[in-house]
Amino acid sequence: MSFKDLRSFIDHLEANGELKRISYPVDPHLEMTEIADRVLRAKGPALLFENPTNHSMPVLANLFGTPKRVAMALGKEDPLALRDVGELLAFLKEPEPPRGFKDAISKIPMFKQALNMPPKTVRNPACQQVVKTGDEVDLTQLPIQHCWPGDVAPLVTWGLTITKGPRKSRQNLGIYRQQLLGKNKLIMRWLSHRGGALDFADFKEQFPGERYPVVVALGSDPVTILGAVTPVPDAMSEYAFAGLLRGERTEVCKALSCDLEVPASSEIILEGYIDPDEMAEEGPYGDHTGYYNETDKFPVFTVTHITHRKDPIYHSTYTGRPPDEPAMLGVALNEVFVPILRKQYPEIIDFYLPPEGCSYRMAVISIRKQYPGHAKRVMMGAWSFLRQFMYTKFIVVVDDDVNCRDWNDVIWAITTRMDPKRDTVMIDNTPIDYLDFASPVAGLGSKMGLDATNKREGETNREWGTPIVMDPKVKQKIDSIWDELGIDDSPTL
């Protein structure tokens, strides 16, 4: 099932008991965060606050608060089915040459589908039903959440930022938080390696001193939103990828103030520009690490136009110590990464980003080990293959007899198959998340790899331990007589 706009997805969630409407007045200042956090930790539904205090616009929260809802947004019922998305991405990133004529013929539909999914431009889009310019532009009229007591100001969190570099044929879609600075100003917090910042840097180089057009879409359809946070191949637009997932082309329209294309079904569109000479101090804000981050200077986004649907819905979230919505999104997208990594490294059995590791700061990988040093090769590959893992600080590699998603198994492997000196890899001066205050220098720190695999000849001179395993025939016999033993086989045993 596909969803052409946010409202159809809301209806689907409500019909399936995955969305709760809250009519009681709730303040976007702190109160929404506390409610959303409690509900998310209880694995509860998405929330639609129908009467935000001092605002007339409803607020949608916890939309992707469970892996199941992320899967539902992509037309799947089970998060494990998201591996199909990963298979598609793996194919698009590095299509294998056909093994013969029949194989070539079988690949034609996928190539044809990929080529036939450019966005579709529509007229009279829903996102431009209401247009505000000049003095009518007032961002304070939006029910922007003030998430934590130490936050400096309200924060736009789910804004889909649309940019284009002067040397690129396609637009970039990225999600960057934006601090409310005034009635028509936001601070655009994009890190230097992100697509929007790279586009801006290219523009400044080619057109020094000129204003850079930017558009932010709020409340787009769920597939387009998720397309902006998946590892789409560089040559493919997020709009085209969203169309592939949806099975039909993404509908877009031209912005009113520039040539950028925006999702036509979005609830709210913010249009404007960034003056290369206007910067402002951003933060502090409570972040996905569970701490308030340091302040830093980022470009100011001046909003010249606000367009929206009639009776728009404001889509929002909060970030904090896991579990939070980004962590749940990470759990779901974990299944997307597995086929992509396996495509490059077939020896990988499974890959896990523990949500308590702030979505990406720790990874655990199980492999079918084939030679000495194999675990270290996989570590280096994981750090370098996808840019999503350039900030991963810790990688643990285990054998295929260890469940990399079970901490009991992983800790057992670390404590029995590792020598701290021999099996620990330390790399200095690597890219680190700017929000990581534990690194000695902002944006630069070290990485650690833990080889918790069984060691082979060349890695050790000692006789290696053999795991204890019960005789299968004995296990089978005990299974057959278990009910007669009168033992409660509850999980507490």
UniProtKB/Swiss-Prot annotation:
Signal peptide, first to last residue: none
Broad enzyme group: lyase
Known catalytic reactions: a 4-hydroxy-3-(all-trans-polyprenyl)benzoate + H(+) = a 2-(all-trans-polyprenyl)phenol + CO2
Keyword Metal-binding: yes
GO molecular function: 3-octaprenyl-4-hydroxybenzoate carboxy-lyase activity; metal ion binding
Binding site for Mn(2+): 172, 238
Annotated keywords: Cell membrane, Decarboxylase, Flavoprotein, FMN, Lyase, Manganese, Membrane, Metal-binding, Ubiquinone biosynthesis
Residues binding prenylated FMN: 175-177, 189-191, 194-195
Membrane topology label: Peripheral membrane protein
Pathway per the UniProt entry: Cofactor biosynthesis; ubiquinone biosynthesis
Family annotation (Gene3D superfamilies): Single helix bin (1.20.5.570), UbiD C-terminal domain-like (3.40.1670.10)
Similarity remark: Belongs to the UbiD family.
Function: Catalyzes the decarboxylation of 3-octaprenyl-4-hydroxy benzoate to 2-octaprenylphenol, an intermediate step in ubiquinone biosynthesis.
Name of the protein in its database record: 3-octaprenyl-4-hydroxybenzoate carboxy-lyase
Organism: Shewanella sp. (strain MR-4)
Gene: ubiD
